[in-house]
């Protein structure tokens, strides 16, 4: 969640111009992808999203993720990240999850329909 005193535009601008760079610094040796997804309203009847950004980091394997987390847990990294996050996030409301992905092969589904 963004800090309440920031507009959505200010939040996104800071994230993409400053905080993203820190993410890249610590993630680039280990991660395959570093993605930020910002919610948009999809029209009439759309719910207001309960978050300001969904950040995804893709790793080749669990060991790569552990290596990235170790780099980001180092004292200097923690200090640098925390200082920047205070400019951007309501840190008490930030949530993190590790998930397992299941992907459908839609090309195979299409071939089954023929």
Located regions from the model:
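Macromolecular interaction modules
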Residues: 1-114
């Amino acid at each position: 969640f963004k800090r309440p005193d920031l507009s959505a535009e200010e939040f996104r601008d800071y994230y993409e111009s400053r905080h993203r760079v820190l993410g890249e610094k610590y993630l680039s040796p280990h991660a395959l992808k570093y993605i930020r997804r910002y919610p948009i309203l999809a029209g009439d009847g759309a719910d207001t999203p309960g978050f300001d950004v969904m950040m995804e980091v893709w790793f080749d394997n669990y060991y790569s993720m552990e290596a990235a987390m170790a780099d980001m847990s180092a004292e200097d990294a923690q200090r640098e990240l925390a200082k920047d996050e205070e400019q951007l996030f309501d840190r008490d409301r930030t949530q993190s999850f590790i998930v397992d992905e299941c992907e459908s092969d839609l090309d195979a589904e299409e071939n089954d329909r023929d």
